[in-house]
Amino acid sequence: MDPGGQDLLALDPGDQDLLGFLLEESGDLWAATEPDVKASLDLELSPSENSVQELSDWEVEDLLSSLLSPSVSRDVLGSSSSSILHDHNYSLPQEHVSIDLGECEMISCRGRRELTGLAGSTFPFADTESFEKEGFHVTPLPGEERAAEQEMSRLILTEEEKKLLEKEGLTLPSTLPLTKVEEQVLKRVRRKIRNKRAAQESRKKKKVYVVGLESRVLKYTAQNRELQNKVQRLEEQNLSLLDQLRKLQAMVIEIANKTSSGSTCVLVLVFSFCLLLVPAMYSSDARGSVPAEYVVLHRKLRALPSEDDHQPKPSALSSELPMDSTHQSLDSSEHMFLVSSNFSCVLYHAPQAEQPLHWPLWDLSSEMLFSDSNLLLQANLSESEGWQPNHSPSLVIFQGRYSG
């Protein structure tokens, strides 16, 4: 056995572990050979350790896998300030690993020191949770605690807050905690930013509302113009209708006046036609009602002088006429009629006489006697004409007053 191995056996077990770790880090200088290491391990264990049941292979593999698991916390790795960039490869001979129950405290203390050194390195497979599950206690480095505290105590300001602070000429520290004055300044700045945003929102809403109002005003203005034009057209139509109504009223009044005058004219015409037609109809009816044995002689005579001067003359004329001449005229075929000037009809009755072939001619020129208002008519019927009455003739004298 070489003197290096004797020195290792003379050292304390904790010092031997530390020395072995240093030798491995320094490139295995003064490293003992494998048999020496085995001998030293055997010497480290007490006689009672030989009686302890050795760990099985799968338990050792489980322990190694837990130590070499890749689930390492990124925060711990990122915040590590260690400058060691190489990995540590630890190889433990499985056949020489044995744990005594009486030395659990020593192993835990030694493992704590080893894990403390490993945690400070950039070992990518270190998992603190797995170590804690296995019974190891992991303590973070002071540098990591400082980095986490610095990140948590750092004051984060937005761009608007920075601009407003620069505009007001104020400065705030980048670390926490802040003083009361600084907190008031920060609150005031943030309140201004909130008010600014609220004002912007209100202005935006107001602008939208004003735009809507302007559009509505334009719309209602156009409608108002259309309604005004419509009202003007309706007023013009109303005036034209009023003019037409006045014209119609004037026409109705004129038509009413014309109707009254026309009706009057029509009534006058109807009355005149009645006056003209009724006598003609009456005369035709009277002529149709006269029997065949009556002969009508119509003659209208007018008296030239006045009636008052010649009123007593008819009686004188009648008295002057001799009875003999009257009887003589009655006995003869001559018939004398004394007729007043107001009467013009003389009826001659011949009930049993035969109707002549033609009307006899009246000879009035030789036998007519005019005496003022009285007219003496004489009718001569010659026997040669063949129409003679079978009865005695009668003398009819009509007298009347002339009403001029």
Curated annotation (Swiss-Prot):
Side Cytoplasmic, residues: 1-261
Molecular function (Gene Ontology), one example: chromatin binding
Topological domains annotated Lumenal: 283-404
GO cellular component: cytoplasm; endoplasmic reticulum membrane; Golgi membrane; membrane; neuronal cell body; nuclear body; nucleus
Record's subcellular location: Endoplasmic reticulum membrane; Golgi apparatus; Nucleus; Cytoplasm
Glycosylation (residues): 342, 380
A matching Pfam family: bZIP_1
Chain location of the short sequence motif LXXLL motif 1 per the record: 19-23
Domain bZIP: from-to ranges: 185-248
Region (Disordered): 305-327
One GO-annotated biological process of the protein: response to unfolded protein
UniProt site (Cleavage): 301-302
Basic motif: annotated span: 187-225
Tissue specificity statement from the Swiss-Prot or TrEMBL entry: Widely expressed.
Reported modifications of this chain: First proteolytically cleaved by site-1 protease (S1P) that generates membrane-associated N-terminus and a luminal C-terminus forms. The membrane-associated N-terminus form is further proteolytically processed probably by the site-2 protease (S2P) through a regulated intramembrane proteolysis (RIP), releasing the transcriptional active processed cyclic AMP-responsive element-binding protein 3 form, which is transported to the nucleus. The proteolytic cleavage is strongly induced during dendritic cell (DC) maturation and inhibited by DCSTAMP. That form is rapidly degraded. N-glycosylated.
Family: Belongs to the bZIP family. ATF subfamily.
Name used for this protein in its record: Cyclic AMP-responsive element-binding protein 3
Organism the protein comes from: Mus musculus
Organism lineage string: Eukaryota, Metazoa, Chordata, Craniata, Vertebrata
Gene transcribed to yield this protein: Creb3
